Regions:
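Conserved functional hotspot residues or short segments at active or partner-binding sites
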Residues: 339-340, 344-513
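Polar, glycine-rich mid-to-C-terminal structural blocks
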Residues: 286, 298, 305, 309-373
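Cleft-lining beta-strand/loop regions that shape enzyme active-site pockets
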Residues: 7, 17-29, 33, 37-45, ...
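An acidic helix/loop motif centered on a single conserved Asp/Glu
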Residues: 48-65
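PDZ/PDZ-like peptide-tail recognition elements
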Residues: 56, 68-106
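Hydrophobic membrane-insertion alpha-helices, especially the h-region
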Residues: 1-14
Length: 513
């Protein structure tokens, strides 16, 4: 039997050897992929989804390059580009999902939802004919159901008090803001929080900074923590606002891309403003271009923790079916000549966890630097390449507040649900408040400490001793006030103003005056 089987195998091999040799002559390395997909389509034993196989093949091929060269199917590509476009077609609300029901956090002024009467604090029960409340409906699926071409209609059913109210909403163009907050911390210090580098970043930042200048700003704290990047040109425009004429911002170079230098034009309105930039382990890409340019030109102070370490530039390649590839075409280099791209490795995506394990998040001395990648700033200070921007002033992760009570509340999102419950209770009053002093007085009257402890106990079964509450409340109370204050007319500005009381990195920046 063994001999017979062996003979059959040899026969099967020889039967196609001539055709295989012929095919070998007809294709080179880069045509193999097309050829094998064609052969699968024509000759595979079972019916298959060729598109699915093609997508998998492209994804596998790009995985051999670098972590940021990626294939994106049509839906994913559309969502990614919409996120950076500065606007999208939808109904015009912001919401969060503190438990299993979406709560309207913001109704965009002048948007479709405001026009029909949706209100902050409404609970979203249905979108179209689909129940989305109480069923742990995926948040990205909620967003997809609410979005759609401008001019189309969707019915959104909300819960308001004891009422269930359906609203027919005609979708429209909705602005997506990248400046999350902008305000004066004191008489001379302004603060701007930027969430991403979108198409509208330069416009939004210019408007915010002009307002702060008019209010007496002499120093700016620019918060790029958790900003994962976006459009390269927007980072250049922001650098231009701070740097003097001829200062180098960045240069790019790749095997098939000649060296491109980018220098400041000297027309920026913030050249004489003291600057502090806040970064952390999730500050990446275009944010690192900005931070690197400021650091290498000795233009400002970088405070926080080592940034992500993405020093690669991608260009889009679009296909007719709506899918596309983001292909790495160059590396970018800061003015001193350093590339801040961290090494590729099998555990690349787990680098942040490794930093925690190695102690880097708690101790500046644990930051691993490559002594062979040392460079000099304009003033002669030593900086390092090879893995993110290392801040001038290190601020560790604060672990002193992690009591059992606080951790238990975080796991169940008790704080967010409490804030939503407080808004339901005090909706008419909170919705009217539009100044900081009035909001502070109202929050004091709400007796948040006892209200929260009662809520945590009755809703989530989480209790604490008086001693544990005292250890926790110094950090937890400002957070609760910020979450409730966000429901006022002051919105995100109220949140960040109140939260800065427990933001150790921001406190360090203020102290650096």
């Amino acid at each position: 039997m063994g001999i017979v089987v062996g003979a059959l195998i040899v026969l099967a091999y020889n039967a196609y050897s001539q055709k295989r040799n012929m095919l070998r002559v007809q294709y080179g390395d880069w045509r193999k992929l097309n050829l094998i997909l064609d052969q699968i389509d024509k000759n595979y034993v079972d019916t298959i989804n060729v598109g699915k196989v093609t997508d998998a093949a492209i994804t596998a091929a790009l995985a051999e390059l670098d972590p940021h060269s990626v294939y994106m199917p049509p839906v994913e590509l559309t969502e990614a580009e919409t996120d950076l476009a500065g606007n999208f077609d939808g109904i015009g609300i912001q919401f969060n999902v503190p438990n299993d029901t979406a709560i309207v956090l913001e109704v965009i002024p002048g948007g479709p939802s405001e026009k029909v009467g949706l209100q902050k604090g409404d609970r979203i029960l249905k979108v179209g004919d689909k129940d989305i409340a109480g069923v742990k409906f995926p948040q990205d699926s909620m967003v997809r159901r609410m979005k759609g071409p401008a001019g189309t209609k969707v019915t959104v059913t909300v819960g308001r008090g004891n009422e269930t109210i359906p609203f027919e909403i005609t979708r429209g163009k909705i602005p997506m803001h990248c400046v999350d907050a902008s305000f004066m911390i004191n008489d001379t210090t302004g603060y701007i929080k930027l969430s991403k580098f979108s198409r509208t970043t330069f416009t939004e930042f210019s408007q915010a900074s002009a307002t702060l200048l008019g209010e007496g700003m002499k120093k700016l704290i620019f918060d790029l923590r958790d900003n994962t990047g976006g459009y390269f040109d927007q980072a250049l425009l922001l650098c231009d606002m701070f740097l003097k004429k001829g200062d180098e911002i960045v240069y790019m170079q790749g095997l098939h891309r000649k060296k491109d230098d980018y220098k400041a034009d000297g027309k920026g309105i913030l050249q004489d403003i003291d600057l502090t930039v806040l970064i952390n382990e999730s500050t990446a890409s275009s944010s690192e271009i900005f931070a690197g340019a400021i650091q290498d030109n000795d233009r400002g102070l970088i405070i926080g923790r080592r940034s992500f370490g993405k020093g690669l530039v991608q260009e889009p390649v679009y296909f007719s079916d709506g899918s596309g590839v983001r292909l790495t075409v160059a590396r970018f280099y800061t003015p001193s000549g350093r590339c801040i791209q961290k090494p590729y490795s099998e555990d690349y995506q787990y680098d942040i966890y490794k930093r925690y394990a190695d102690g880097e998040m708690y101790d500046a001395d644990s930051i691993k630097v490559d002594s062979t990648a040392a460079y000099k700033t304009v003033a002669g200070r030593t900086v390092y390449g090879g893995g993110g921007i290392i801040p001038d002033v290190f601020v560790p992760v604060d672990t002193t507040r992690a009591t059992k009570f606080y951790i238990a509340c975080n796991k169940k999102a008790t704080q967010m649900r409490f804030a939503s419950a407080m808004f339901d209770k005090y909706k008419s009053r909170l919705s009217e408040i539009d100044n900081d002093a009035e909001l502070g007085i109202f929050l004091d009257r709400m007796n948040i400490p006892s209200a929260f402890r009662e809520y945590a106990s009755s809703k989530d079964g989480i209790t604490c001793t008086q001693k544990e509450w005292e250890e926790t409340s110094e950090y937890l109370l400002p957070q609760l006030r910020a979450l409730v204050g966000r429901y006022s007319k002051l919105g995100e500005n109220a949140f960040y103003k109140m939260y800065l009381n427990v933001d150790v990195t921001l406190k360090k920046a203020i102290e650096s005056d």
